Amino acid sequence: KNVVKGYAESSVYGGYTANSEFEFLTGCTKTFLPGNPYLQYIDDYLPSVISNIKSQKGYGEAVAVHPYNPSGYNRNRVYPLLHFDRFLSIDDFKNPLLIRDYISDKSDYEKIIDLYKNKKKDKSLCVFNVTMQNHNPYNFDYVGDVKVTDFSVSSQVEQYLSLMRKSDDALKELITYFKKSDEPAIILVFGDHQPHLPDSFYEKLFGKNPVQFSREDSMKEHLIPFMIWANYDIGEENIERTSINYLSSLLLEKAGLKMSDYNRYLLELYKEIPSLSATGFYDKNGVLHDNKESTGKYAEMLKEYEMIQYNYLFDKDNRLDKHYNVMK
């Protein structure tokens, strides 16, 4: 009940979490960008979903949480430029529960609840949380409770699936807490990328070696699950396929918050090109395309998106700020 769920295309596989963060927080796509935006492109303040949420009536603090090294991917420098008020890193967790060498999702979510309990009474709170529990590698000395009997790489697969089960348990506790809250709460959970497991595992799943993957296979390899849940009525919806660059606009829409022209543009683009990543894109009819298409309706749409993204990221002197910000 009150759940919008489905699958989203990620532009990365097996790592580079910050690229998925970038797509979500900015609405940009890695389709048009090489490298890592956190390390290469963000050197000044940028409008973001965070600045737009903070501009809404009744919103107070926006906090980023990542229970690991604060300097990883330049997060300690980039988060303030995307309008976070605070950044809590591994240094802000006292005696957390560890699973393998990483702070557990359980302790991570307890930090979110603690932030909520200590927020200003008359203000809403926005938290962007990047967990660490399930980070690779998956060959730690760790005995989980999921057993796989079919795969030759069962030890790594078992470890990853056992970690996912721990994540499910922690998420259940988080949602149970906010179900009981008298204040409205909405939670979006999404994966950053698929795990880097041995090729033999994916060969078993796909029936072929990854070096033989088609573009369609590669798109499947980049799919991640997402879920929007609220403790109030947002309806129910199953979304077969979208991409991370659209998720923040979908969240604003489901939460009933004001949107910028840019958010509305992305939701219109989503109707025509519902899934877009560095690997390729699907049109509204479910047809898979190469990003390098140079002619036709969808090529024109992608060119427009690329120009808007250039104006947003790089054209500081001519940036159409009113297009990217919620106008009061």
Region roles according to the model:
Residues K1-K328:
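Solvent-exposed soluble domains appended to multi-pass membrane proteins
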